[in-house]
C-alpha cells in the first residue's frame, strides 16, 4: 500500500473516502483501522501458509476486508458514489469455504491454544481481530453512525 501524507499535520483528523473529516480516535476510524490490523495478521498467515489453496482463500478474505473497510470509511450519504460493497455472494463464498474446510479437518469441541504453526497462529490472531472489528461495527450501527452495511 502506498503511503500518502501531506507534511502539513492533520491535528488528529483523517478523511473518509468522500472527503468528510473525522477524528482519528473516532469509532468509525477505530472500526476500519481494526479491519486493517486483521488483514495484516492474515497477510502473515498467507505468507507462511504451505498450501496454494490456503493462500488463495486468505488473499480473497483480505480483499473482502478491504471492501468492508472502504464501506466503513464512507459516510452513508457518499455511499452511492462508490461501487464497492460486500454482497450476499461474498458471505456465501465464505460459508462455502468453511463447509469445505470443515469436511477436511475435524473441529475440536473444546477451546484451543493457538500456536501449533505460525500460519495457524496468525489466522487465529486475524480471527480475533475480525471479531473485535465486528463489535466495533455493531456499535456504529447501534449509534446510527453507519447505515450502509
Language model region names:
Residues 1-149:
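Phosphate/pyrophosphate-binding loop motifs in nucleotide- or prenyl diphosphate-using proteins
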Amino acid at each position: 500500500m502506498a503511503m500518502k501524507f501531506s507534511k502539513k499535520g492533520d491535528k488528529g483528523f483523517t478523511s473518509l473516502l468522500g472527503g468528510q473529516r473525522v477524528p482519528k480516535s473516532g469509532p468509525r476510524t477505530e472500526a476500519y483501522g481494526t479491519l486493517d490490523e486483521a488483514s495484516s495478521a492474515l497477510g502473515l498467515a498467507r505468507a507462511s501458509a504451505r498450501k496454494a489453496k490456503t493462500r488463495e482463500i486468505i488473499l480473497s478474505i483480505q480483499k473482502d476486508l478491504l471492501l468492508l473497510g472502504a464501506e466503513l470509511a464512507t459516510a452513508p450519504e457518499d455511499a452511492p458514489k462508490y461501487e464497492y460493497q460486500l454482497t450476499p455472494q461474498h458471505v456465501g463464498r465464505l460459508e462455502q469455504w468453511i463447509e469445505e474446510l470443515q469436511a477436511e479437518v475435524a473441529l475440536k469441541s473444546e477451546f484451543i491454544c493457538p500456536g501449533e504453526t505460525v500460519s495457524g497462529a496468525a489466522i487465529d490472531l486475524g480471527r480475533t481481530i475480525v471479531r473485535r472489528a465486528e463489535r466495533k461495527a455493531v456499535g456504529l450501527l447501534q449509534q446510527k453512525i453507519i447505515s450502509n452495511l
